[in-house]
A protein has these predicted regions:
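Acidic-glycine-rich active-site phosphate/pyrophosphate-binding loop
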Residues: 24-42, 111-116
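Short cysteine clusters
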Residues: 17, 54, 101
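DPxDG-like acidic metal-binding loop motif
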Residues: 58-67
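Phosphate-handling active-site elements
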Residues: 29-38, 66-87
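Transmembrane alpha-helix interface/packing and boundary motifs in multi-pass membrane proteins
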Residues: 43-50
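Polybasic, low-complexity association/targeting segments
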Residues: 1-13
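C-terminal binding/interaction regions
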Residues: 85-152
Length: 152
């Protein structure tokens, strides 16, 4: 199974968008999966259901940071990492038009609720939500990039 399908499967099992993406790449990260899952959960729903930057995009950025940056505080490190994130975000925008959670939901003609509690994951939820496809798209872009860079 490719990582994009794995991410979509994880989302369909009830994980947040942010968790699904990072867990699909967890074997590449020197942090155990349980900690990764906890670390990125607040990013789901566009940062705690505030419908800002898509949680899947945020987790993709974290994978890039872990794999391509270092702990040094210098401009070269920052600029190299930022350039990769910008490239991958632009690839996502080409396919999906935006990285904003609210806008992605509106494209699916859904009413956008900001804040509040997570919705119950029912079959109806999965039918109407674009999130599984979005998680797949983010993970596919990241997977392709990592293959280009011969990381996987």
């Amino acid at each position: 199974m490719n990582r994009a399908s794995k991410a979509q499967e994880l989302f369909n099992q009830g994980y947040a968008c942010s968790q699904a993406v990072i867990l699909a790449f967890s074997d590449l990260i020197d942090i155990d999966s349980e900690k990764l899952s906890k670390l990125v959960l607040p990013l789901g729903g566009g940062l705690g259901r505030l419908r800002l930057t898509c949680g899947a995009i945020n987790s993709m950025s974290m994978v890039i940071g872990i794999l391509f940056s270092n702990s040094e505080s210098n401009e070269e490190n920052k600029n190299n990492t930022y350039a990769i994130v910008q490239e991958l975000v632009n690839r996502f925008i080409e396919e999906n038009k935006t990285i904003n959670c609210a806008e992605l939901l509106k494209q699916a003609e859904l009413e956008v609720q900001i804040g509040g509690k997570a919705e119950e994951r029912t079959s109806e939820y999965y039918k109407k939500r674009p999130c599984g496809k979005i998680v797949y798209s983010v993970a596919k872009i990241l997977e392709e990039f990592l293959k280009e860079k011969e990381v996987i």
